Swiss-Prot record:
Catalytic reaction list: (1S,2R)-1-C-(indol-3-yl)glycerol 3-phosphate + L-serine = D-glyceraldehyde 3-phosphate + L-tryptophan + H2O
One Gene Ontology term, aspect cellular component: cytoplasm
Protein's name in the database: Tryptophan synthase beta chain
The gene coding this protein: trpB
Cited function: The beta subunit is responsible for the synthesis of L-tryptophan from indole and L-serine.
Cofactors, names only: pyridoxal 5'-phosphate
Record PTM N6-(pyridoxal phosphate)lysine, positions in chain: K91
Family stated for the protein in its record: Belongs to the TrpB family.
Superkingdom of origin organism: Bacteria
Annotated EC: 4.2.1.20
Oligomeric and partner information: Tetramer of two alpha and two beta chains.
Principal EC category: lyase
Pathway field: Amino-acid biosynthesis; L-tryptophan biosynthesis; L-tryptophan from chorismate: step 5/5
Length: 399
């Protein structure tokens, strides 16, 4: 591969950068130096991959969804099974890499933000594994939606701190985590959960998540002798998607990112940042974000706690602007329908986030021939969503 961005200023075209206060600049520069040193150290990379192999369960399987493919009657659908990774989602790939970097830097404490709770669980897990103190900020509303994950984090020894401002969701948890980091940067590592934030975070998280796409590309070629026609992944901040897409960027493969349309992109209740947003700055990075006419960030909505972020990773913004990746949006209802279909036909209950990608894949499969194929990143399992699903499928609906 010859893809080389971001540039030395942390820019993906016009997107990205380091929009942080002076009080954080030294911590950012310390991180950047440590990251460059680590990523050029073969022993560090080996250590990272070995921990993922023997502790997290990599490589994850590539599963041919035979029943689903035959039911739809079009393209063959293959699932990259990040739901099988320890803790139940792709988040551990990144948490593992950053925790190893934190230890290398001599940090004793980890601070993180979480939306659905999966990144929080992954961070608490890895902090327990490596003997690090862990503090996780989580929106008060998300804590109610994801009470099981809150308890998991506490069971793993983490302190979960509610973010009570604004919409009480991921954006606010991120604000609180950054605020805490500013005053504790000497002994604390900020372990960000997606390809967002100031440089070098988007690049670092991508590089720790690209193991998804690297594995999937090799597995797909081994199984089929070719590459998929299309690759599809859901996009909130966008780490599972960029990790899946990155190794395919220079291949003749269509890449589709799927955002949360919530109750419809024509309403105000969605989280379709690329589809409906405008360029602005959020959490230290220039990217697309949901904002009103006065430039104030608007509150995103999705049934999925992991997709309701008002921004998006700057690399996704860049790939959208160049046209290399196509971005679309799927409603709550479409995602839940796809979740039910996969559960019934394949015996796999996906996370609601992943179900957004599945909905688009099922739609695309019917438009393609049986000789063509679609690779979907199944970014996580649906255990955390069972309460929401029970309310929905037993007739209460989701308000």
């Amino acid at each position: 591969m010859t893809v080389t961005y971001p540039d030395e200023r942390g820019r993906f075209g016009t997107f990205g950068g380091k929009y942080v206060p002076e009080t954080l600049m030294s911590a950012i520069e310390e991180l950047e130096l440590a990251l460059n040193d680590a990523m050029n150290d073969e022993a560090f990379i080996h250590d990272y991959k070995e921990h993922l192999r023997e502790y997290a369960g990599r490589p994850t399987a590539l599963t041919y969804a035979k029943n689903m493919s035959e039911t739809l009657g079009g393209a063959k659908i293959y699932l990259k099974r990040e739901d099988l990774l320890h803790t139940g989602a792709h988040k551990l790939n990144n948490a593992m890499g950053q925790a190893l970097l934190a230890k290398r830097m001599g940090k004793k404490k980890i601070v993180a933000e979480t939306g659905a709770g999966q990144h929080g669980v992954a961070t608490a897990t890895i902090a327990a594994r490596f003997g690090l103190e862990c503090k996780v900020f989580m929106g008060e509303e998300d804590m109610e939606r994801q009470a099981l994950n809150v308890f998991r984090m506490e069971l793993l020894g983490a302190e979960v701190v509610p973010a009570t401002s604004g919409s009480k969701t991921l954006k606010d948890a991120t604000n609180e985590a950054i605020r805490y980091w500013v005053t504790h940067a000497d002994d604390t590592f900020y372990l960000i959960g997606s390809v967002v934030g100031p440089h070098p975070y988007p690049q670092m998280v991508r590089d720790f998540q690209r193991i998804i796409g690297d594995e999937a590309r090799a597995q797909f070629q081994e199984i089929t002798g070719t590459l998929p026609t299309e690759v599809i992944a859901c996009v909130g901040g966008g780490s599972n998607a960029i990790g899946t897409f990155y190794p395919f960027l220079e291949d003749d493969v269509k890449l589709i990112g799927v955002e949360a349309a919530g109750k419809g992109v024509e309403t105000s209740q969605h989280a379709a940042t690329i589809t409906k947003g405008r360029v602005g700055v959020i959490h230290g990075s220039m990217t697309y974000l949901l904002q009103d006419d006065a430039g104030q960030i608007t509150e995103p909505y999705s049934i999925s706690a992991g997709l309701d972020y008002p921004g998006v990773g700057p690399e996704h913004a860049y790939l959208a602007s160049t046209g290399r990746v196509k971005y679309d949006a799927v409603t709550d209802k479409e995602a839940l329908d796809a979740l039910k279909q996969l559960s019934v036909h394949e015996g796999i209950i996906p996370a609601v986030e992943s179900a957004h990608a599945l909905a688009k894949a099922f739609e695309r499969a019917k438009q393609l021939s049986q000789e063509e194929s679609i690779l979907v990143c199944l970014s996580g399992r649906g255990d955390k969503d069972v309460h929401t699903l029970m309310k929905h499928f037993r007739g209460e609906g989701h308000e």
